[in-house]
Amino acid sequence: MANILLRDNPLNVQHWRRYIEREIGFVLPDVQLQWLMNAVVQTATAHKLTVFQLWMTLPTNSELRQQLFDAVIIPETRFFRHIPSIDFVTEFALQRYKQAENTGSCDDECFRVWSVGCASGQEVWTLAMSLASEQLKNFEILGTDVSEKALEKARLGQYDKRQRCTIPQHFQKFTQPVESNDDLSDIVGSPKNKGSDGIEHDRNSPSHWQVAPLLRSHVNFVWHNVFTQEKPTSDLQQVIICQNMLLYFRKFDQRDILKRLSAQCAVGGYLVLAPGEALFWRPSNMRRIVHSQINVWQKISA
């Protein structure tokens, strides 16, 4: 099928590689070029187009573009992926709350966190679990990504049981089994098995558990292309987390993205990057915090 779709096609993989970079900034490495062409063929096949017809249709069809992006992007993430970063954000939130309490000020400002490139939402839900576990209530976590398919999963908040194993026991209270919509399932004996966590899971269901409803009011998932000038929100953030995403961009694009992220950060707030990322960055309004485990910058002026 791929050979048929590629027949009489004047485009090669480099055309598609440049197209992806132009649209969303991602510079795909050589090892992902076969994945890229598989995504192109998959998208063309789904719409009964040749690869060349797909190319010609993309400029005027935003839905088709989004489907191609969804097929190309690999949403790699997991719960509690980098615990030192999560702990840092939680401690900062607690510090702000205690300072307001000690001074007697009525600081009811919402504690806002933005997770950039949140994929299917695990980092956002992780942050929500960590803040809620400290009895904090006035916080909002924004998750953004360029993959609408990944965001749909994030909003659903349902994951397979293997991912639950990465959540520390202290936070398991923020998870619960997925309830079946089929009221007859128990009557007809729908196949179930008991996992290592002692909870029965429907083997026919791809989603075995979900985040607790009490967390949903604190999170919001929005489509956003960080490569563009558009802002996902007008609210300044106390913390912005952007980890393991900048590596997909060229250095000069990384610099532009970091500048836009710092503009969205409130004075006194923090920008948390992955260890080793953006070591070339020297902004005048941010200072790097000395920390043994995380790569964090504090905004010191507007």
PLM region spans:
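Conserved beta-strand signature within the Rossmann-like core of class I S-adenosyl-L-methionine
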Residues: 267-275
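Core SAM-dependent methyltransferase catalytic element
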Residues: 239, 280-302
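Conserved AdoMet
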Residues: 2-114
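Conserved class I S-adenosyl-L-methionine
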Residues: 108-121, 142
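A short glycine-rich, Lys/Arg-flanked "PGG" loop and its adjoining helix->strand segment in the class I
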Residues: 255-267
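Conserved SAM-binding loop of SAM-dependent methyltransferases across substrates and taxa
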Residues: 120-135
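Extended basic-aromatic, gly/pro-enriched interface segments that bind polyanionic ligands
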Residues: 139-241, 245, 249, 253, ...
